[in-house]
Structure formats: C-alpha cells, structure tokens
Amino acid sequence: MIRIFKTENGLIHQKDELSPGSWIALTNPTATEILEIANTYGIDPDDLRAPLDEEERSRIETEDNYTLILVDIPSIEERNDKDWYVTIPMGIITTEEVIITVCLEETPVLGAFMDGRVRDFHTYMKTRFILQVLYKNASLFLQYLRIIDKKSGVIEEKLHKSTKNRELIELLELEKSLVYFTTSLRSNEVVLEKLMRNEKIKKYPEDTDL
C-alpha cells in the first residue's frame, strides 16, 4: 500500500499525487508499487525491498541521490492467544524531493505522524522527521520493555507457587523478547551515530533538542 502525506499550513494531509516535500509511506508494498517509487525517484528496488526482509540488519547506506536508513522497530506478534514482543525492520529513504518509509506492517511508530499527533512535524523537514521517528521508536521500545518487565514479575510470582511448564515457557519467551530488544537498540544506536556523522544528511541547529 502506498500513502502520500504532506504538511500544509502546519497540518498533515493525505494526498493522491506525488509531489516535492511529501512523505511516501509504503506498507507491505506490492512489486508494482515498489517499481513505481523506484523509477520515480531513481532508487534501487532492492533498497526498497530490504525493509520487507525480517532478517535485515540495522544499517545506513548512502548512494548518489538518496540515503537508506534501516532500523529495528518493536512489534507485537500474536501466538496462542497471547501477545509476544519481537522486532522487525523499518526503512527510511531520503531523496532531494521526498522522504519514504517502508515497513511490512502498520506501526505505532509512524501512526502518530499520520494522525497529526506529533508536534513540530513537517514532511518537508526531512532531517527533523528522521530524528522524530527515531525518538518515537525509542519511546515505543521503552513502553514495551515496561510491559515485559511487569509480565515477567507476574509470571515469576506464579512460578514460586507452581511447577507448571507453561509459566516457565512464558518466562523464557519474554527473556527472548528482551534479547531481541537489547540487540536491536544497540544496532539502532550505531545507526544513529553514523547518521549524525553522515555528510549527506543536513543538520540544523533547531534539531539539536531532538
């Protein structure tokens, strides 16, 4: 799915046509949609497909006419009527004209921007948008970590009163989520450090508070 957003008079609007200063949000895009965006903005289709591969690692790559930023974001996976916490890739691509996000699924990381719930957000301020997305992502990780911590405490209490395997399996699953999150946060930190050193990403004094 392709959705186009643009800030006008301080408000976010969904648009029907591509134009400079827009944010193009690709969610589980089809092969046709990938080729359309790739051809329009001179992007290697493989770079648009990369965030759709769950095995992709966080990284930043700079090409002649665009920069690809890949980070891990937290996601909730439902199994056996329970919520489990995993990570999936999300791509941010900046060109001279637009900013593009690519993800396998809808994510709260981007939902707040689409709904106009983020202050001082402008689709044409690409560097600020990237930093705001990374901040929102880090906040979501922390939110889920608090939930995992609370769930772990409840299960540990049950384990003291029970010897059932079910509680032990749940605790091991939560421990696995913590490992995923820790690894992803470290990788994202490296990407952020490289991003701040990247000469192709313009830096503005007003973004230092982010």
What residue ranges belong to the model's regions?
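Peripheral, non-transmembrane regulatory/ligand-interaction domains of membrane transport proteins
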Residues: 1-209
